[in-house]
Amino acid sequence: EKNYISKAQECYRHAEKKKKPGVFGKIFSNREERMSEAAELFKQAANYYRLGKDYKSAAEAFVQCANCVPEEAHQHYSEAGNLLRKVNTSEAIEYYNRAVEMLASSGRIGMAAKLRKQIAEIYEGDDMLGSAVQNYEHAAELFELDNSESTANSCHLKVAELSTQDSLDSNTILKAIKLFETVGQRYLQHNLTKFSAKDCYFKAVILFMANEDIVGAENALQNYFNRDPSFETSREGKLAQELISDIRASNVNSFESHLYQYNNITPLDRWKTKVLIKAKNMLNAYEEPDFS
């Protein structure tokens, strides 16, 4: 590793000399050629630093590459970001953001979208859900512009799940419901994804329950059954019907029993569990109106 570092330092020194030559060097050499050669040496330095596991220095060498050849800067900023992810995620994001802006402004929307999604994944991994949601939203917009519907859908679902994992206030819930409905409808349009629609619709229904809107849950469920008849006969569709009936009857034991039976066969993930716990609160809040 020490040998790699010394080679990296040597390349870096040569690159700096190419970048800032003396008076005679400036007179007798072409600036564009000098910068191109300097960039190549900085790149070599970066790769040697990488082999020597000095990721911060490797990233700095790629940043110097970007300064030498601005037309390729997005590529070098992206490389710097990849290296810094190992040591400093906030610095990595800074360089990823620069790369995204350059890619988007030059019309390379697909590449910008992929990088924006990477940023979102870093924030999600660091449990910074608000920032993750913002970046997944932006990534979804870019994927839509690039006509990459499948990846856009996955980003929309991330927004819906992470935003409601972070906060179950009414506005956040309603936005998430719309996203689940939109993606569910899109899934139904393709044979490969139509069987995934029921999961989107189930998540939307339990969000209505968590929002203490039993009428909305009933109406939505009927609407989803009309759109996707297979949902009505699925375990998720039946569970949604049973939970609504339990809430209507203010029957906590039955609500818990139905969830227990379902969970024994198909374990509920953390997100569904959190939403269903909030939905269970409706059993305390909901009472049938007394018309006697």
PLM regions and their residue ranges:
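Structured C-terminal portions of repeat-based eukaryotic scaffold domains
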Residues: 137, 149-292
